Each structure stands twice: as structure tokens, then as C-alpha cells.
Amino acid sequence: MTFEKYQYYYNEAVKIRQKPEIALAIENQTKLSEDAQAKAKKRYEIEDKLYELYHSIDVKGVDDSIFGGQDLPEHERLIQLMELWMKDDPKINVLKEKLANSGLQEEIGNLENEYQNALYEYFLALIKLDSAINDSRENLFTQEYKDKLKEYADKGVLLYFLETPDAPILCEGITIDDVIESFSFGEFISLKTLFYHFVAQENPSPSMRRKTEDIVSAVDCLEHGQYRTAARTVFALLESEHKNCSAAMDNYFTLDKRVRKGKQRAERIQQLLDGLKEQTYFTKVWDIVNPLYRDILNSKAESFIDRNSIIHGDYYSEQLDITENDVIKLLLLFMNMRMISDHIQLYCEMLRESLKYTEIHIAQELKKEAK
């Protein structure tokens, strides 16, 4: 992409962002995002304190006393624990004694109340942000724009992570190659910006830290012309996201074995999305992403490079001669997969936490009535 072409592309994108309705949507989403980040920080600070307190207590023998050494789903463990507590069953005495001897009951109780409030505020902030983004996608994305997104997706360029229609894909003279190359222009500044929020996370979990390291590594290899190495890393990132997405409710209602086959994972993801029927955007995107990724796993994707020859090092194959744009397309696919995964995991977490606190509240009220 020449400097003149990028300048034209950039100026057209700026014109779109300056439209009053789009500028307002971006401003609103930015404020809601900042609020959600602040609420998330508060939630995780309290969660970390609770984790440290709970893990400072000697709980040896508690599990055997309450559950008899049974391996139970998370929800079933909660139900059994509440039933024992309501009946003042002697089985729960071991836990009561451990808590009493720790001297931390009052502090933990106060923090649990703070955590419930912080969790509620966090979820509410995320729902507001999610709703604002959905409104933008519904009202600001014209049918012509949506059709162009689908046309691009059919050619392996997925831009469904856009929250406002500011990529100038409808502008005269802008081609699909221009859009891909816009991510690599100027030392990959646009691509790095796209993935910046991964790098900017405070105190990420060990798994998230490793994933971020691989994202940085993939972009770095891409920038230095090491396309096959970058592609292998992105294939690993895609595989990880597919697994995480499919396992969002594992071991909650039933004990689930972690599925290893792509087809089984895809079926689980579809089941989870079917349970979130009010959110149609992600279901539509999944209907596009799923067959594409399935074809990639089976080395049948016409719009993407051959995965098997890259992963298994078939150095006699000409399919190993890949380009910069091939890797960018994979990274864009990963961003779309990550968007779907985040959505599913967020709403599954909301479901789990809502059920937990609802059932605890019901148990407390029933015990009061029984006295």
C-alpha cells in the first residue's frame, strides 16, 4: 500500500468517525468501556483479597466431611452444602470450626458482601456496554455495509469485531486488499492498536499472560517476515480460544470431559449460543466463523492457508510459501473468535453467579422461616 493510498483510506475513515451519530456512539462506548474497566478492577481486587483469606485457612478434611470424597459438579456441591447448612447437619461442623478457628469470619463476611455488590456493578456495566455496542451494530450498520462485511468474510477477511462502521469498506477505490494492507502499513500500527487491549491488561491470569505473549510474538514475527512462525502461533491461539469457548459451562451442572475434537467443541459452542437467544449478533457471526474454522481444521478452507502443512512442517509443500496478508487474515479471524468467546464466557459467568447468589438467598430465607 502506498502512502497516498493509506492517506486516502485513513481520511475516509476519519470522515466516517466524524459523522455526528457515529462520533456520539464512539464517545458513549468509550465512557461505558472506561466505567466497565473501573468496575472490573474493583471486583477483582476484592476477589483477590477473598482468595488470599480463604487459602490461608486449613481446610484439610472439609471436602471428605461434607461431600464424602465425591467428585460433584459445582452446582450440585452448592446445593448439597446449602441443604446441610439449613438442617444444621453435623457434617458441616468441620467447616464451621475451621472458619471459627481462623478468626477471619467477620472479615470474610464483610468482604463477601462487598464482592456481591462489586460483582453486580461490574455485570451491570458490562451489560450497558454490550447493549450500546449492539445498538450501534443494529442502527449504524446499513444493510449495504452488512452485505459488504459478508462479502469480505466469504473471502477470508472478517471484520465483525467492528463496533461502529468506521472501516471505509464502501468508499470508492477501496478494495479488500487495501483493507488488509491497512493493518500492516506504518510498521503494523493498526494491527498493534487492534490487539493493544490484550497487552494493556493489568495483572492478567497466568493463561492470559501466556496468550498475550503469543499474540505479541505473532505480530513481531509477522513484522519481521517470519510468516510461517507467525501463522503457527495464530493457529495455536485459535485452537485455545475454540477450546475455552466450548468449555464455558463445563463441570457446572454436569461433570464434563474436555472435548478434543473440533466438531464436538463446535457443537458445544452452538448449544451455548442457543441458550443466549436474545443476543442474535453473535449467533450470526458464529454461523460464519464456525464453517470457516471447520474448513481450516480440515485443510479445506479456500480463503485461508493450509493449516496442516504449516503445523506439521510439510517442507516439501509449496503451500508453506505464505504471505503477510495470509497471516493478517488469520489474526482477524482470531479477533472474531475471541469476540464470540468473550461474549459466551461473560454470559455464562453471569448465569453461574446469579444462580449461586439466588440459591444462597433462598436458603437463608427458608432457614429464617423454619426457626
Predicted regions and their residues:
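Charge-enriched, short contiguous segments at helix-coil
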Residues: N290-E359
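Internal, Lys/Arg-enriched amphipathic helical interaction segments that engage polyanionic partners
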Residues: L72-A200
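Solenoid-repeat scaffolds in large eukaryotic assemblies
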Residues: T229-A231
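Short, mixed-charge amphipathic alpha-helical segments
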Residues: E202-S207, Q270-I305
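Extended alpha-helical coiled-coil "stalk/arm" regions
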Residues: S33-K91
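Helix-loop junctions and short alpha-helical segments
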Residues: L158-D220, V234, L238-E241, C245-L272
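Charged, amphipathic alpha-helical stretches
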Residues: M1-S56
